[in-house]
Amino acid sequence: MKTLKKATNSFGLAVLLVVGGMQLSAADSATEVAAIHAADDVWVKAFNAGDVDTMVALYEEHAVLLPPGAPAANGRAAIRALFAKMAPAAAKDGLEFSLGAKPAGGARGDFGWSSGTYVLKDKTGHVIETGKYLSVSRKKDGKWLYVRDTWNSDGPPASTEPGAATKK
């Protein structure tokens, strides 16, 4: 009987710890998701300013960027090279990148993700592209860094018909 009572008490304690931990995890998760979204906001501001250094600092050393219609950029050096072509030119042309109003996200332990929509406007405010993104992050030394990042346009894919690029 003592063994059963001891096992029941142990089980009750385990349930209490798990349920209590779940509640703490939900609160912690909301805080972590907010931190992930804050990193997304830093990325957007840096892109719009053509600030490649700030953009690249948001990626882990061995992160992989998966741009649409192009090979993967593996590691910070390749990510820097890609963004060095994109961000300063976009800033110079007055393009404005923004994220949709309701991004999704989640966090569990040292991993988290964010997903949502984006809009790219020209300097007159005309929408030239809409799309969606998905980023996976890892928390390292208290900071969320992207480990995988991808996006794609809502527009139709480029034609694969031979000579389509030269047709009007």
Name each model-derived stretch.
Residues S115-K121:
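Generic short beta-strand segments
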Residues S10-G21:
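Bacterial N-terminal signal peptides
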Residues G109-W113, K132-L134:
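Structural motif
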Residues K2-G12:
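Bacterial N-terminal signal peptides that target proteins for export
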Residues T130-G155:
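Short beta-strand edge/turn micro-motifs at domain boundaries
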Residues L4, G21-E61, A158-K168:
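Short, low-complexity N-terminal intrinsically disordered segments enriched in polar/charged residues
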Residues A30-H37, V52-D110, T117, V127:
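A solvent-exposed, acidic/Ser-Thr-rich amphipathic alpha-helical stretch
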